[in-house]
Amino acid sequence: MFAVELLERLGLPTIYLWIGFVLVVLLAYPTYFAIYNLYFHPLRKFPGPLIARSSYIWYAKNWIGGRWPHALSDLHEKYGQVVRIAPDELAFSSAQSWRDIYGHSVKGKKYFRKTDWYAGVGDLPNSISTEPDPQKHSAMRRVLANAFSNSVLKGQADVINKYLDMFVSQIKKHDNPNGIPVEEWFNWLTFDIIGDLTFHESFGAVENARTHFWIHLIINGNFIRSLYPIFQKIPISRLFMKWIIPNMDEIRQQRREHIAHTNSKAMKRANRDDIVQKDFFSFLLGKEGADTSEMFLTAQAHTLIIAGSETTAVTLTAMVSFLLRYPDKMKILIDEVRGAFTDKSQINVEGTLPLEYLFAVIEETLRILPPVPFGLPRTCPGAVIDGHVVPEGTIVSVSPYTASHDVRYWHDPEGWHPERWLPSDHPLHNPVFDQDNKEASKPFSTGPRVCLGVNLAYIELRMTLARLLFEFDMELLSKPVDWNTELDFFQFWKKVETRVKFTSLH
């Protein structure tokens, strides 16, 4: 080897020769890698920061640093609607790219398969959210689709109302001059609801007015899940995580405990034969020929609990925070809610549907703060995306946060304006928003892999916010936070303390 021969001529001992050789290799490989990526890679023509086009450093720094949605949005503002964010990855932000990447495979459109980013958790098999094979995913979706249909969810309103009644009662009991941290309380509510709908058994968080230990396990476990993309792109990074994150072993143990507890809950539910009101497991277990193995059921339960809790909780917290920052908009919604209902029993799935301003508040909050703000990566089969020829094997995605903040599609995209979602015949309709391209906002994705729980999310958001405004006046006690720019992101948004004083009206 030339490098070793060169070092031998210097008359150094053998050990130093090999140390020198290793150092040469360590320097030569990244140099070669960077030169290839910049000048010879099939994606070399796409714009982006030098450090992102040549290596994974930009990706790792911003993903681990908690500012991913904001950093990516800044890149699109600088470079345009397609940006190279890693040597093998492109990020898009156009409305058309939503359809090109995630849309249904019709009229010759090729299928964009999920990447290894979605690999199953631990020893669990793939679930409905992580399965990359389109045929296997379709089979899973057929099993669960009926569970999330509007007709079935309408029948689950009693479950939601049971926890809303308990939630309201606990607010009245525990409210004090210092208020209550609604970001924590909304977690209790959404975890209890999804726990009951999945396992026919809640976590008891609302009833006991404290965070169930499993909720802690889930939230903390999500942090290590957020590191998986870095481990995949830079395998050697696993060796350094203990130094970067000193409590990594503790976090990993919590992740294992979470999976074990999920398995225990799933098997307990699977072995029950006294269920009258159908829950999600009723559909998993009731489909003839469906996979009912222990690990499969655990994987589905893991996905259902995570997807149906934290995402809804952060949206509820953000809505309340925005409304309390803008009293004029809060008054409009209060008037709509209290003008529509005279009794809490009227606040149900159908009763909240006609409330147009409530719908607008929800949609605008989801636009400003998509619960899953990062782009869901897909492998390009070799296709044209929004006019760009993208080579086969390229990782591509659209960031919901970036697309919903793009000045090309929105008037004052950084402002929170529920009015932009009102129909033209509404008294508060403002024509300044008529040119907004609402197709750019896809908080639940789109196409055949659109979030299965979208109907449940809207029902919970409508019923919870309407019920709180019917029951209480609210006052923000904590320091106002710009939810649009100040939140950090680690797999999910990291909520900030939002203390609210509630004054009961009934």
Curated annotation (Swiss-Prot):
Its cofactor is heme. GO terms for biological process: biosynthetic process. Its EC number is 1.-.-.-. The keyword ATP-binding does not apply. SUPFAM superfamilies: Cytochrome P450. One of its GO terms (cellular component) is membrane. Gene3D superfamilies: Cytochrome P450. It is an enzyme of class 1 (oxidoreductase). Induction: Expression of the botcinic acid clusters genes BOA1-13 and BOA17 is coregulated by BCG1 during both in vitro and in planta growth. Keywords: Heme, Iron, Membrane, Metal-binding, Monooxygenase, Oxidoreductase, Transmembrane, Transmembrane helix, Virulence. Pathway: Polyketide biosynthesis. It is a single-pass membrane protein. Heme binds at C451. InterPro entries: Cyt_P450, Cyt_P450_CS, Cyt_P450_E_grp-I, Cyt_P450_sf, Cytochrome_P450_monoxygenase. It holds the Pfam family p450. One of its GO terms (molecular function) is monooxygenase activity. Belongs to the cytochrome P450 family. PANTHER family: CYTOCHROME P450 (PTHR24305), CYTOCHROME P450 MONOOXYGENASE ASQL-RELATED (PTHR24305:SF210). Cytochrome P450 monooxygenase; part of the gene cluster A that mediates the biosynthesis of botcinic acid and its botcinin derivatives, acetate-derived polyketides that contribute to virulence when combined with the sesquiterpene botrydial. Botcinic acid and its derivatives have been shown to induce chlorosis and necrosis during host plant infection, but also have antifungal activities. Two polyketide synthases, BOA6 and BOA9, are involved in the biosynthesis of botcinins. This is Cytochrome P450 monooxygenase BOA3. The lineage of its organism: Eukaryota, Fungi, Dikarya, Ascomycota, Pezizomycotina.
